[in-house]
């Protein structure tokens, strides 16, 4: 196979060092450039065919400083720690939002205030919670704090920052406290016991809080009894079904602290800019301000951080020669692949000493961009080929730490990444962000773009569009993107299914009251009904002889409900993160090495026999998928193609392949809508080999069918037969229904508290339908819960 094709270029000219500038083949110059020079260079080289369809310039914003009021008195040790650790003068150099947040947290108010800080990327939100936490824990030897981050990388990043700060506490201080991480990477019993017994600031994630800390709370008596602060960072990540689970986990934590350990932690929440910060905070932690004695939540949105000038380019890949009038069915092949284009831009960034992140929507795209970029650099600047890497989920923890460190230090100049680096990990000063397709929300796009130009530095962001309708809409209507408001973050803590799951977990941790009272404060007005259902199913048991307690709300003695399950938390996946996974084992040499892991549900998509698996730019071929040992064997292979599995997903109601009875077709439209259990089955039948550069399929391999399935709930709308018969004469109704289903999926988060990955729809394949005409497929909209 040939290397990825480059777009046509004009005649080259020589630069000062004698290298060509890229107009007649790959740019071989390695002269450093600033952002403005680089944009001009792109216009003359890679974008010479008019790929830059819009330029948006965002003006700089100066810093707004503020000082703390006299009501807040920080200790000398705290002031010295931040001054020596990160060079921050807490007396005079705080941004306005930092000062507002610290005053709200440490100020003497009744009722006490929880705080939500919503500001832009790299605005110094961590100072808002680190200052009060450090000051309080230095002053009180019994006080503890819990930091909760959505990713392990963020936890490691915050650990490094806190250790630098605490290393600068004056030697005379006797109350310097221990900091520890408690997550899945801390595997030994000894290490976990050390964190529990001695550390006073513990960094974790919602998953570990759910499956380990709360169920084993009796091992955490010291920590929970002294809990003063709970930090929820990157709260905008807690949305949809995942956010609803996190909201119930937080309520379980509050319940144990209040009812068993006599503590009442103050919540400090930080978030990127969202449309509804106060409502989101209320939904997450459960304080809605409706009771006179209830804590209130203070919103801090006066972002005082500076921002440098940012140039934002919309980049539409060039049309292939003669492709401007292609029909719709061929349109996905009419442009140069955006994967190649973004790889060329990334290579140029590295060559001209601009530090860059290239955001990709999937792991496979991330690896492909790295492969293409290295191939380009080996041709144009071979000594820089190792200056790029990829970063995504599935890598071993040690490998992730090395990449983070090398990006921060400048050893790496470019990284192709999934949204794993979207959140606020400190990777140093970046110049450029690249975005391969729309990431799913305006908020995510700005969060990613905000990684470049931290503080006053000038920055560039380039959004490279696919040929799909959404990307092309933004390419043609840029104001629809740049004038769009930030989306709302949704959490539905009253989701009855999720409430039931977490009430079982809560009953395991501490038996529930059988009647309304204390526990309704945490689980809402549906708690009584949910508890009754769990009793009827035998999941909760009433034992008045053994469990009788005083209910202070009802002022009577009441029986308690105990959980009959041994480990209910293990049965609740808070974000479909699977405990089961396949190890990817490199068997290229006699010393086998685990290089990554793949979730069990994705194994048939990624590591089937014959699959091309890429890891840090290395191409490997999967030679064996061991289902019993859950291992995928891969070995090095020099191939110029990637593979795409062939599969079909079908939706059916358990008990029969047909969802509808014969009488359904005569019902009015309003009666054709149903909601019930749905079975989702995926059958894998083979794979295609796809050429890297052209993206053309050139071979197909079949293998014995394999299948996976899961049960969930769905809603569907049957299209009446009379409409089908009339419309089918003039239009492809099945394709229209398929398109409409995806349109509904995209619009659903605007009306329902869910994320874009929380729901799926029934998809139709014209080819498969023709091949498998023996199987009845009713024409319908069908949407199902992915969880």
Language model features: what each stretch is:
Residues 443-492:
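Conserved segment of the helicase C-terminal RecA-like domain
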Residues 184-228, 406:
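Conserved helix/coil segment N-terminal to the catalytic DExD/H
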Residues 236-303:
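Post-DEXD/H (motif II) to motif III coupling segment of the RecA-like Helicase ATP-binding lobe
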């Amino acid at each position: 196979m040939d290397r990825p094709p480059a777009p046509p270029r004009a005649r080259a000219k020589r630069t000062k060092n004698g290298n060509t500038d890229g107009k007649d083949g790959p740019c071989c110059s390695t002269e450093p450039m600033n952002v403005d020079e680089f944009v001009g260079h792109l216009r003359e080289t890679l974008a010479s065919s008019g790929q830059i369809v819009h330029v948006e310039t965002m003006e700089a914003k100066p810093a707004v400083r503020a000082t703390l009021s006299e009501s807040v008195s920080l200790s000398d040790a705290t002031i010295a720690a931040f001054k020596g650790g990160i060079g921050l003068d807490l007396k005079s150099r705080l941004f306005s939002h930092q000062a507002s947040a610290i005053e709200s947290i440490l100020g003497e108010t009744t009722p006490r205030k929880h705080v939500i800080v919503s500001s832009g990327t790299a605005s110094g939100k961590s100072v808002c919670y680190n200052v009060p936490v450090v000051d309080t824990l230095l002053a009180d030897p019994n006080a503890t704090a819990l930091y909760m981050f959505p990713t392990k990388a963020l936890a490691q990043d915050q650990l490094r920052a806190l250790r630098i700060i605490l290393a600068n506490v004056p030697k005379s201080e006797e109350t310097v406290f221990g900091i520890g991480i408690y997550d899945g990477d801390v595997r030994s019993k000894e290490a976990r016991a050390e964190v529990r017994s001695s550390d006073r600031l513990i960094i974790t994630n919602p998953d570990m809080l759910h499956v380990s800390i709360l169920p084993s709370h009796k091992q955490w008596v010291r920590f929970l009894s002294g809990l003063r602060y709970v930090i929820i960072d990157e709260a905008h990540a807690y949305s949809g079904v995942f956010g609803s689970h996190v909201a119930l986990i937080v309520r379980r934590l509050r319940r144990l602290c209040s009812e068993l350990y006599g503590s009442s932690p103050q919540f400090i929440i930080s978030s990127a800019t969202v449309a509804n910060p106060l409502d989101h905070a209320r939904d997450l932690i459960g304080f809605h301000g409706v009771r006179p004695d209830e804590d209130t939540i203070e919103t801090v949105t006066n972002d005082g951080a500076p921002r440098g000038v940012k140039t934002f380019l919309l980049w539409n890949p060039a049309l292939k020669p003669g492709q401007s009038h292609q029909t719709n069915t061929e349109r996905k092949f009419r442009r140069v692949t955006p994967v190649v284009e973004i790889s060329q831009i990334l290579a140029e960034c590295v060559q001209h000493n601009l530090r860059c992140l290239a955001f990709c929507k999937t792991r496979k795209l991330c690896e492909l961009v790295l492969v293409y970029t290295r191939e380009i650099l080996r041709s144009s600047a071979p000594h820089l080929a190792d200056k790029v890497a990829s970063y995504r989920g599935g890598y071993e923890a040690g490998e992730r730490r090395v990449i983070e460190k090398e990006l921060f230090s400048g050893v790496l100049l470019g990284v192709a990444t999934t949204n794993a680096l979207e959140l606020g990990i400190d990777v140093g000063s970046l110049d450029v962000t690249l975005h391969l397709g729309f990431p799913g929300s305006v908020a995510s796009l700005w969060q990613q773009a905000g990684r470049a130009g931290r503080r006053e530095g000038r920055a560039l962001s380039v959004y490279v569009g696919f040929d799909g309708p959404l990307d092309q809409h933004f390419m043609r209507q840029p104001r629809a993107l740049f004038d769009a408001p930030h989306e709302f973050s949704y959490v539905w803590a009253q989701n009855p299914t999720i409430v039931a799951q977490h009430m079982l977990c809560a009953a395991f941790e501490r038996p529930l009251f059988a009647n309304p009272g204390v526990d309704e404060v945490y689980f809402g007005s549906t708690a009584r009904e949910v508890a009754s259902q769990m009793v009827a199913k035998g999941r909760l048991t009433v034992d008045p002889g053994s469990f009788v307690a005083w209910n202070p709300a009802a002022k009577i003695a009441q029986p308690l409900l105990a959980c009959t399950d041994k480990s209910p938390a293990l049965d609740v996946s808070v974000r479909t993160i699977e405990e089961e996974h396949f190890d990817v084992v490199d068997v290229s040499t006699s010393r086998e090495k685990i290089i990554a892991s793949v979730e069990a549900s994705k194994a048939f998509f990624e590591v089937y026999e014959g699959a091309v698996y890429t890891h840090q730019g290395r191409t490997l071929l999967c030679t064996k998928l061991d289902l019993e040992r859950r291992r995928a064997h891969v070995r090095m292979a020099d191939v110029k193609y990637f593979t795409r599995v062939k599969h079909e997903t079908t939706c059916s109601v358990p008990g029969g392949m047909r969802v509808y009875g014969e009488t359904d077709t005569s019902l009015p439209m309003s009666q054709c809508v149903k909601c019930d259990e749905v079975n989702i089955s995926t059958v894998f039948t083979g794979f295609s080999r796809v050429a890297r550069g052209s993206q053309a399929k050139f071979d197909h391999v079949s293998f014995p069918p394999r299948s996976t399935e899961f049960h969930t709930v769905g809603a569907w709308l049957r299209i009446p037969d009379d409409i089908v018969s009339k419309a089918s004469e003039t239009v492809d109704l099945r394709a229209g229904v398929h398109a409409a289903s995806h349109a509904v999926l995209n619009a659903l988060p605007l009306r329902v508290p869910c994320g874009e990955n929380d729901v799926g729809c029934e998809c139709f394949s014209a080819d498969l339908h023709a091949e498998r005409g023996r199987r009845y497929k009713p024409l319908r909209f069908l949407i199902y819960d992915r969880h």
